[in-house]
Amino acid sequence: MKDLLKFLKAQHKTEEFDAIKIGLASPDQIRSWSFGEVKKPETINYRTFKPERDGLFCARIFGPVKDYECLCGKYKRLKHRGVICEKCGVEVTQTKVRRDRMGHIELASPVAHIWFLKSLPSRIGLLMDIPLRDIERVLYFESYVVTEPGMTDLERSQLLSEEEYLDKLEEFGDEFTAKMGAEAIKDLLASMDMQAEIEDMREELETTNSETKRKKVTKRLKLVEAFVQSGNNPEWMILTVLPVLPPDLRPLVPLDGGRFATSDLNDLYRRVINRNNRLKRLLDLAAPDIIVRNEKRMLQESVDALLDNGRRGRAITGSNKRPLKSLADMIKGKQGRFRQNLLGKRVDYSGRSVITVGPYLRLHQCGLPKKMALELFKPFIYSKLEGRGLATTIKAAKKMVEREEAIVWDILDDVIREHPVLLNRAPTLHRLGIQAFEPVLIEGKAIQLHPLVCAAYNADFDGDQMAVHVPLTLEAQLEARTLMMSTNNILSPASGDPIIVPSQDVVLGLYYMTREKINAKGEGMYLEGFAEAEKAYRTGVAELHARVKVRITEVLRDENGIETRETKLVDTTVGRAMLWQIVPEGLPYSIINQKLGKKQISNLLNEAYRTLGLKDTVVFADQIMYTGFAYAALSGASVGIDDMVIPDAKYTKVADAEEEVKQIQEQYQSGLVTAGERYNKVIDIWAATNEQVAKEMMDNLSSETVLNRDGEEEQQESFNSVYMMADSGARGSAAQIRQLAGMRGLMAKPDGSIIETPITANFREGLNVNQYFISTHGARKGLADTALKTANSGYLTRRLVDVAQDVVVHLDDCGTYEGVTMTPLIEGGDVKEPLHERVLGRVVAEDVLKPGTDEILLPRNTLLDEKQCQIVEENSVDQIKVRSVVSCEADFGCCANCYGRDLARGHMVNQGESVGVIAAQSIGEPGTQLTMRTFHIGGAASTAAADNSIQVKTTGSIKLHNAKHVTNGEGNLVITSRASELTVIDEHGRTKESYKLSYGTILTKKDGDAVNQGDKIASWDPHTMPIITEVQGQVQFVDMIDGVTITTQTDELTGLSSIVVLDAAERASAGKDMRPTVKLVDANGNDIMIPGTEMPAQYFLPGKAIVNLADGGNVGIGETLARIPQASSGTKDITGGLPRVADLFEARKPKEPAILAEHAGIVAFGKETKGKVRLLITRDDNGEVYEEMIHKHRQLNIFEGDKVERGDVISDGPETPHDILRLRGIHAVTEYITNEVQEVYRLQGVKINDKHIETIVRQMLRKCTITHSGDSTFLEGEQLEFANVTIANRQLEAEGKQPARFERDLLGITKASLATESFISAASFQETTRVLTEAAVSGKRDELRGLKENVIVGRLIPAGTGFAYHQERQKQKAVEQEGPSAEQATDNLAALLNAGFSSEE
């Protein structure tokens, strides 16, 4: 019988739903949920503690207080299950029904729901098209509203004040009706004809021309259509019945001393019931209108407070002056239902303790204290004890465990074997913050952690704590072992580099072991293999660092896994030969035959992983660690004060600098330099001195002179402990050593400006009081910053995760030919990242051809791994088009080919991988390392002088890209185009350097010329912008009248005169409309045409231009007609660090953005208005003229008659991503955001793969705006999900109809998260009330596609191992739609079984 009950219960699983819909509840629906009306405000009887009948905790309505027992105690026990007691009316059932049975309150007067009234934009107001202020006046009984105008001249929904109403009553009698309060609003809503409204509005949209009107109408139209489609009735926004929450969700707990702890909701409900009952009584008594009205208003206010306290007026407070927590407060915010209970739960079978080092552990192990293990694995131990017959009952087993009998420990050993546990360190910033280990039982009370995983956890042993969790089910154990085991997480998901990298002691040990020393004991010996080397070292015949010759055998594997053995004699040291014994077969000896620093060890592990695979690498990593620790101990490297050697040159250099500063001070006092110049010069002097002292000090520390075997002096690297620690990368850096032994240097104030007196002392000498005080100044700011940084970084991660959580790999291949074109990353002439590094792990979108031929190197859809990238490098391919997440055409999530390699595993990404969350974590996790500050240019920061020439750093040939140029008299090229670029290529055709060329740059080489390293190939004047002539001829001035449009200035020193054009604003009225121009004519005075065009060669001069020519003089091609002074642009603040990353992802518009050309065409200037310039572009494509107004103070980079391309920069400034998207397209904006974000991270030395940033950008581009609706149902100007539009368009095209046209939109991450399809996900992120209100009104349906929604409803997530389950369900759903539904089948079965059993019972 019991089994059958279980079976029937199991049939109605809650998981069997596919979507969640939210809507407005009708009064009937509320009554149908309810189990009875709550009539009294009483809660429980203070003497008996029994709930009062008909009160807020009534047992008759909500269910029994004790399991299977009615209130009066007449019926007890299971056998009366389902009986309703005739005395107290309580049903005999489980007490847990008190958690889900609801009640209701019949309101004596309708009440408006505050969410739909006050949550902006007010839904009620928008729907009725009445301002919110007016509606509130009606609701709170300040004015009347006309509900039925009848035959009068009044309008429907017109407001009347008390006096007006009385006047109209006298005038029209009962011809019309006007009411106040929620009833009036309810009547108005009830009498609205939705369909008619929709038709009116559609008509209005077609006829109106006003943009604001159109926007307003579209908004309202959307709302009305949503009401019609969702089947919501607008009058349901006014409540007539109020649901009452089940009592166990608003508990009342008696404390000792006769007091009660209660949920605030009970107070709020009591208020409502009291006022409602009073109102009913007043209505029965037919009390005067004014009293009833006041009571109705109070009822409205109390219901408002219950639903959302504090949204209107002052919040209702409890006895202790704090606002009561209303229903809305229960679900929103960090402590609300969503974030506290649904997205983050507490976990049983867990414990936490302090961590210590476990240097003897293997990589997959952790040390677990016995006491802890015993507690965590209790149930397993009980079952084992029972199973082996050592204990008869669970109770006996419990006793045995409590007594800690010897047998229990043996059993614990058994239980733990092969049962992984999860270790987690808070804050868990990326997925490596939780990993699985096999526990090893240890004495003591601290968890032991393997040192190599510290980097992933960001753990240290200064008191950090970690939590242990036990995976219970078999599936959980399987996942822990196969996916989360520390040995499976060797590579970082952010960059694909090893994250299991030795640091500190281990690095120092290996470094010490592989150093060489001149003339060490045993130098020049010949040794047979590492065994003999070890013997020589152990017996003291040879020192660790002695240079010797050793015979070694290398085993190398080629691509096909064929091994070749090679034995050879190599020059090496004893230490390196001994290290060779732990290196696995398959790696070359050369990889360890060098001094190993942190970088080299990282490469060693990376190489091992790529060539040997996971298993060997893990063993190797452990061996490296043990060896490193051992030799670090033997090295005896320690820091003493004498290790910090102060260079003698320091004192003389400091004295020289002080002398120089004194001179500048004197110059300043005699007025030769300004205060700003003096400050900058002083800071430059000290910065340079600091550098020199540091250099001297490092040279001093890093080398020492020793005698070699022949007794000659020789330089070798020093064995100074401090130097070794820094050089190996174990601890410290040159900058820190500089502070210890050089000079501390310049200090910054908290606002970022630099204090001009540096600290000349170092820590070895010690600081005096002044110096100490200056130090504390900046240091304190650093600490304050760190605290802020952590919070900001956490918030950025949260927003990123939220926006990207539903990007999961759904398909194998979406089949797109789109992609991004990758080129080497070049900055200021240096290759920052070569091409083969950037494309590693991507899939090729188009065949890669061998440069200069049609031979296909790599076919389309190849995943580029290390081997293929080498092919790319060898053939010096300079650009490759690769697939990208941004251009992926999958409707939901993305496809595997567009994503490419799973960085943490090194192979193609699997289906179901949640790449969005990984991307968010990879960008957010290093957030705490980024700086918080905005760099102010000043002092040391701006020392870089303005560049005025290009010197090439490599030998090769030069290549010009989209450059127009003319040849001047000297035979040099002069650039006449705006956005040209010059690159230097080596003999293999690889781009080595790249420079931007500005207009007017003079080149000494031509396209394709060979250059040598150090050649100066280009020069320009950084302070002015020239106007270059493209033809030769005679100068003729037009509209250049001295004193009106120009002034002549004579330089006092040289006596040369120059003409300066006046700004239009400064001219007299006569010169306002004149346009100073330089024209070129031939000898006969005829206009010269610009070659290849019909345009005369005339050059308009902007204000402030300087002309050095005389009227009638001759000029040659490529000469400068005029110069325009450039305001130096180096004084803007650079926003750096975290705030910059946040700005980029939020797609914020900068203050003064760059102005870009909206169309390709020819530029002209129109009439100027006050403060603005009118820019005209005659379009190439259709000859139309586009005009734009630009502020006068903006400096324009173009002249009249210039040709611009769409998206060209017209005025400099930071570019807005929105403009880039609109004018240059989706790939340009992706590249912009990627590069800008990478720049910030690169500064901090953090490596993140581009594809993570692209994944976020894809989510920012989720929405699009309809520009033309075609045959679709979309409205013009409507913002929709991109996927939905593409799906709809596909369908329209299939039916031969016209698809909708649209423009992609770029949304910031916060906006994008709130604009997701899923209202559950959006509500749990931010602005819960607004999201839910909107969703309810439009009757939204959540398809539960993302991860967050599924976590909230308590299912497996549709990613990772849960992906298969969801795929299966979707398949089943498709099958079910054909046959009868599964639920019907179960119901039929249940009915049959019921019929069979009930008779017997």
Curated annotation (Swiss-Prot):
GO terms for molecular function: DNA binding; DNA-directed RNA polymerase activity; magnesium ion binding; zinc ion binding. The keyword DNA repair does not apply. Signal peptide: none annotated. Zn(2+) 1 binds at C70, C72, C85, C88. Gene3D superfamilies: 1.10.132.30, 1.10.150.390, 1.10.1790.20, 1.10.40.90, 2.40.40.20, 2.40.50.100, RNA polymerase II, clamp domain, RNA polymerase Rpb1, domain 3. Binds 1 Mg(2+) ion per subunit. GO terms for cellular component: DNA-directed RNA polymerase complex. Mg(2+) binds at D460, D462, D464. Its cofactor is Mg(2+); Zn(2+). The keyword Nuclease does not apply. Keywords: DNA-directed RNA polymerase, Magnesium, Metal-binding, Nucleotidyltransferase, Transcription, Transferase, Zinc. InterPro entries: DNA-dir_RpoC_beta_prime (IPR045867), DNA-dir_RpoC_beta_prime_bact (IPR012754), RNA_pol_asu (IPR000722), RNA_pol_N (IPR006592), RNA_pol_Rpb1_1 (IPR007080), RNA_pol_Rpb1_3 (IPR007066), RNA_pol_Rpb1_3_sf (IPR042102), RNA_pol_Rpb1_4 (IPR007083). It is an enzyme of class 2 (transferase). It comes from the Bacteria. CDD domains: RNAP_beta'_C, RNAP_beta'_N. It catalyses: RNA(n) + a ribonucleoside 5'-triphosphate = RNA(n+1) + diphosphate. HAMAP family: RNApol_bact_RpoC (MF_01322). NCBIfam families: rpoC_TIGR. Belongs to the RNA polymerase beta' chain family. DNA-dependent RNA polymerase catalyzes the transcription of DNA into RNA using the four ribonucleoside triphosphates as substrates. This is DNA-directed RNA polymerase subunit beta'. The lineage of its organism: Bacteria, Pseudomonadati, Pseudomonadota, Gammaproteobacteria, Vibrionales. The gene is rpoC.
